[in-house]
Amino acid sequence: MNDIENLDRPPAIFIMGPTASGKTALSIALRQRLPVELVSVDSALIYRGMDIGTAKPSAQELALAPHRLIDIRDPAESYSAADFRKDALKEMADITAAGRIPLLVGGTMLYFKALLDGLSPLPSADPQVRQRIEQQASELGWGALHQQLAVIDPVAAARIHPNDPQRLSRALEVFFISGKTLTELTKISGETLPYRVHQFAIAPASRELLHQRIELRFHQMLDAGFEAEARVLFDRGDLHTDLPAIRCVGYRQMWSYLSGEIDYNDMVYRGVCATRQLAKRQMTWLRGWSSVQWLDSDKPGEALDSVIQVVSA
């Protein structure tokens, strides 16, 4: 696409970053200064009844700056990158039609990638293949299947945790159905985003600062009633750790605690560690992201001015 074609496209803003980096605060500040409407790009915030453990914007924050694509699914329901792309494109079109600018904010980098580059031509799920994989897992364990994936598709295996059965199963399923690896197929892009996108990433200047923010926020969540929130979900009886909602960082560790598998202190330790690992994965995505302008979490005024300056140019 040449520059003239790009200028003809309506503007959009991406505010990306690791967990606990200040994305929400920056986006709300931008809502006060620019003609923007916010769209959440977060695979955890889509779930109803999961407010504290996902650091969902508060009622006061949502009153200041409403977010679209929050609270759109029950925790028992699934939601894919394809679902997100379809929903986000509709919200963006509605915002643009109203003469305003879509501002997409969140940390689910797979969603941002699906929106920006389109979706790869992955095969549909095959229940028989999936059942065969799950049978193998029950006999050999997911660790053995992860080793199998490491031989077939080492890039995907390095990215997928051995304790993530959904993503591990999907990577193997794609190979067994198509004969091509997930890594090969995801290099083939689909329809690109029909917007002129200003892309920003916000993060603290050092990993140590980010780790401190993550630990502080996890304790703030506990003080705010995270355990009680998780217990309501636990007591429903229809939710389990194979569901994406319950595998969300923090909830998975809380589930182990509520099940009696680990004690409270271990839950806190594991929850903080898992959140740091999530932030590390998010930062890895972002460091390989092209056309992104970095902002410093610890200089919110400068970050705000930088975005306004670029978007208003």
UniProtKB/Swiss-Prot annotation:
SUPFAM superfamilies attached to this UniProt entry: P-loop containing nucleoside triphosphate hydrolases (SSF52540)
Lineage: superkingdom: Bacteria
Membrane spanning stretches: none
Catalyzed reactions per annotation: adenosine(37) in tRNA + dimethylallyl diphosphate = N(6)-dimethylallyladenosine(37) in tRNA + diphosphate
Binding site for ATP: 17-24
Annotated site, Interaction with substrate tRNA, chain positions: 108, 130
Cofactor (UniProt): Mg(2+)
Annotated stretches, region: Interaction with substrate tRNA: 42-45, 166-170, 247-252
Positions bound to substrate: 19-24
Keywords: ATP-binding, Magnesium, Nucleotide-binding, Transferase, tRNA processing
Protein EC: 2.5.1.75
Entry annotated with the keyword S-adenosyl-L-methionine: no
A GO biological process held by the record: tRNA modification
EC category: transferase
Gene Ontology MF annotations: ATP binding; tRNA dimethylallyltransferase activity
Pfam family name, one: IPPT
Role: Catalyzes the transfer of a dimethylallyl group onto the adenine at position 37 in tRNAs that read codons beginning with uridine, leading to the formation of N6-(dimethylallyl)adenosine (i(6)A).
Oligomeric form and interacting partners: Monomer.
Family: Belongs to the IPP transferase family.
UniProt-recorded name of the protein: tRNA dimethylallyltransferase
Organism: Yersinia pestis
